[in-house]
Structures are given as C-alpha cells and as structure tokens.
C-alpha cells in the first residue's frame, strides 16, 4: 500500500534508538524526509546514516528537546513539518511516598509540556497547509495504571487529556492527533527495567525476561519495526478520519473489552 506521504517532512523525537528509531525508519521507507533528535550525538548520527540509505533527506539535531533551547534548535532545522512524532523516555520508577515536587515537575516537563510545546509550534501551520499528522507516543498506562510508574502515569495521561479537544478542532483542516500506547517492547528501556528487577530479586535476567513475556498473551515483546509500521499508517493519507484516538499496542495485555 502506498501511504501517500512521499516527499512529506517529519520531526521524530528521541529517534536514535528504540521506538523513535522504528518510527523514523518506517517513515523514511515511505519517502518521508526526517528530522530526528536525541541527546547523544554518536547514536543519533549512526541512525541518521542508516536512514539516509533510504534515499531521503535526514537531518540529525543533537539537543535536549525538554529544554526551550533544544526545541528551538529542532524547529529551526524543520520549521514546517507535515508530521510530528512526540516521543520521550519515561520518568524513573519509584514509590509515591518518595517523589518530590521536583520529580513531578521533571516528569510533567518531559512528558507533557514538551510535546505540547512542539504541537503548539507546528499544528497551526499544518492546519493552514491542509495536512498534518501528530502522533504522541505515550504508554499503556493511559488505559491502566502501572505500579511504580506514578510519574509516567500522571504526566502521560495529562498530555492525552490536553490534546483531546484540539484533535477534534484540527481534523477539519485534515490534521489529526492520535496517541499510541505501547506495552512491552524490546527496547533499551525495557531491558534496563528487566535487569533491575532481576537484580532486586537476585535471580537470572533470563528468568525475569521469561516471566514478563509469559505475562503477554502474544508470548513475546513487540518490535520497534512493527511499532513504526503502525505509526506510519496513522501518518498516511489513508488515516485522515482517525483522530483523537489512543491506540493500545500491547500484545493483548490489557484485559478489557473497551
């Protein structure tokens, strides 16, 4: 299927690895020019080189997008994107009793205020041009809270609520805003949390990994490639009637019908 977005321009945040990289790869395969950002120059430039093999224009921007200066640098590199993929690593796990006001501020800054600032900077240009696709990568915690991830639960749910009305307004101009709610995907973050769980229990990493996979009805973790394919479709010309939705991709893990 031709997604109809060849020649479009996209910003993909946190795209040097993991789910962000999967999204950038999927868009590049469809002929989309991509501006990618991350804080680590080495990994970002390596990803940019890989993406360039698709024949599209790839612009890497080394920055901390959670800062105003970082967002300014990113938007200077691509001031008029047709596609915006908001993505950020989640806040650290912990216990509610131990979280400080500063912990909450950082969580909200990184996972709510930053994507909202990028949306505010780009959505109105998209509306004027008559095409835009915004995808917020959040978390399965939007559907069901995840223990020990209260910081992420709160900040990501805040973002989801904040864009709900805008999604209904922007769609009249062929601009959609949707959320993708990933469950367990084979990423550095998941491997890191699995390692910590194994260390805390003093068991082998393979034991915890097997337990986590067994808890997923699909019997495995998701891949960044299949995640990116879903995001690319939501960015396509065929998805203009899908907006304000939050799509859970978790291998069947959510135990509800709705």
Where are these regions (language model features)?
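Short C-terminal tail/terminal secondary-structure segment
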Residues: 144, 232, 243-258
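Substrate-binding pocket helix/loop in short-chain dehydrogenase/reductase
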Residues: 95-97, 103-108, 212
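A short, exposed helix-loop element centered on a Lys and neighboring polar residues
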Residues: 119-120, 164
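Alpha-helical segment proximal to the catalytic Tyr-Lys
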Residues: 124, 168-169, 240
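Conserved glycine-rich cofactor-binding loop
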Residues: 14-18
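Catalytic loop of short-chain dehydrogenase/reductase
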Residues: 135-159, 163-172, 184-185
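Short, small/polar-rich loop/turn modules that mediate ligand/substrate recognition or access, typified
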Residues: 171, 176, 242-244
